[in-house]
Design a protein with these regions (language model features):
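Mid-to-C-terminal alpha-helical segments outside catalytic/metal-binding sites
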Residues: 2-12, 21-76, 108, 115-123, ...
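Active-site gating loops and adjacent loop-to-helix segments of metal-dependent hydrolytic enzymes
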Residues: 22-56, 92-103, 107, 198-216, ...
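Short glycine-enriched loops at secondary-structure junctions
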Residues: 80-85, 136, 194-199, 323-324
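Catalytic pocket-lining loop regions of alpha/beta-barrel enzymes
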Residues: 127, 134, 140, 146-317, ...
Length: 400
């Protein structure tokens, strides 16, 4: 018996990753950099297992990717980078900001990726929303890259992290007002992904990696209070900001803390000597969050989703993190059952598709037609998961 849109959920993942391989990126690179690229490519040793094994082609193989996502019940995706673009030491999400000397080559590298991504998304424009990359070393170049991304069919911009004391201004600096202005003008959401790009150098000590793992989330989370408390959303009242794969449990406490600090400052209890920014915010920080911010909740556990109502059910967007090992593929349907069984259908339609469609401009009608064939059944998601797949690798299945 055939099913209809009403029988199934439309699932758009707010967090997926893709990228070209080095041979593909070479085709998209400015010809002026080809000789240097060939020399760099000959020296480069890829440290990432998932970019060496059979799974690596999920990043760029159109047929494989669509087939696997259909089987997993996912019909749309927000596309973040994953592979290593020209002249980078690692993937962009975890790479530190380039030095002044590294900047020209790295800029050529992300522009090659952006060109590749525009073509990748154009192959399935209904199903893919790509995020163009920028670097913050040169604001004028970043603004130009944002305009290029909009003109070439991409759906938003990926905001890098800024580690302390790197020589690049922090995100709370007015330096970046031209970036916020052009994103507001173009109705281009600004998206910040969890990762190591904003983490300072931890040194080479026995506990360095432990400290990195403990603190990487904090350095990503900082972007939220940097933008809110510095008045970015007051100056740019139509700007949209998304935080993806950064967890959810920390957000209510962070908003409470910002509100408390703001309240104390405006009442003159403390902080006047530290600067006027928070004192001049006409409203509590949590109100700016409720109007401007969204959360890409990647592979949320049953406990994580308990925070969604405090965050705002119209602010949360589910993500699979395909094709990462910690993501829910190939058991996204089982993950949804584990985390969301018993939830109200209308609420889940918001979390699974409506919110992300609003932010990134997906055509829900077109995706509903695809989901009518492969989306998870509403009745299936409502049924609690009793047995976790034995080969599941996502923390969604093992976190409380």
């Amino acid at each position: 018996m055939s099913t209809t849109t009403a029988d199934r959920y439309t699932i758009i993942s707010s967090d997926c990753h893709a990228g070209g391989n080095h041979a593909q990126y070479r085709e998209y690179l400015d010809p002026a950099w080809l000789d240097e690229f060939d020399a760099w490519r000959g020296r480069y040793k890829n440290p990432f297992r998932d970019l060496q094994d059979d799974g690596r082609s999920r990043n760029w193989d159109d047929e494989r990717r669509i087939t696997e996502m259909d089987a997993d019940g996912i019909v749309g995706e927000v596309v973040f980078p994953n592979t290593v673009p020209p002249f980078f030491p690692t993937g962009v999400v975890i790479a530190p900001a380039p030095t002044a000397e590294e900047f020209p080559a790295r800029l050529a590298g992300i522009r090659a990726h952006n060109r590749w991504l525009a073509d990748f998304c154009a192959a399935h424009p209904t199903r893919r929303a790509g995020l163009g990359q920028i670097l913050l070393n040169d604001v004028d170049e970043a603004v130009a890259d944002i305009r290029w991304a909009k003109d070439h069919g991409l759906s938003g911009v990926l905001l890098p992290g800024v580690a302390p004391n790197t020589g690049i201004d922090p995100l709370y600096a007015p330096t970046y007002d031209p970036i916020w202005a052009v994103c507001q003008e173009l109705e281009f959401p600004v998206t910040h992904h969890g990762g190591g790009s904003g983490v300072p150098d931890m040194g080479r000590f026995p506990a360095s990696m432990t400290m990195y793992i403990l603190e990487v989330g904090f350095y990503a989370n900082r972007a939220l209070w940097h933008l809110i408390m510095s008045g970015v959303f007051d100056r740019f009242p139509e700007l949209v900001f998304v935080m993806t794969e950064q967890g959810t449990g920390w957000i209510p406490d962070a908003l409470d803390r910002m509100d408390s600090i703001h309240d104390s400052m405006v009442k003159g209890k403390f902080g006047g000597e530290l600067g006027p920014a928070a004192m001049q915010l006409p409203r509590p920080p949590s109100e700016y969050f409720a109007e401007h911010c969204y959360v890409g909740a990647s592979f949320p556990s049953a406990d994580d989703v308990n925070q969604f109502e405090r965050i705002g059910l119209d602010r949360v967007m589910w993500g699979s993190d395909y094709p990462h090992r910690e993501g829910t593929y190939p058991y996204s349907k089982e993950s949804l059952r584990l985390s969301f069984a018993g939830w109200d259908e209308a609420t889940l339609r918001r979390i699974f598709a409506e919110n992300v469609a609003k932010v990134y401009g997906f055509d829900l009608g077109a995706l509903d037609a695809i989901a009518a064939e492969c989306g998870p059944l509403v009745a299936e998601v409502a049924e609690p998961l009793e047995v976790i797949p034995t080969d599941a690798t996502s923390p969604a299945f093992f976190r409380p």
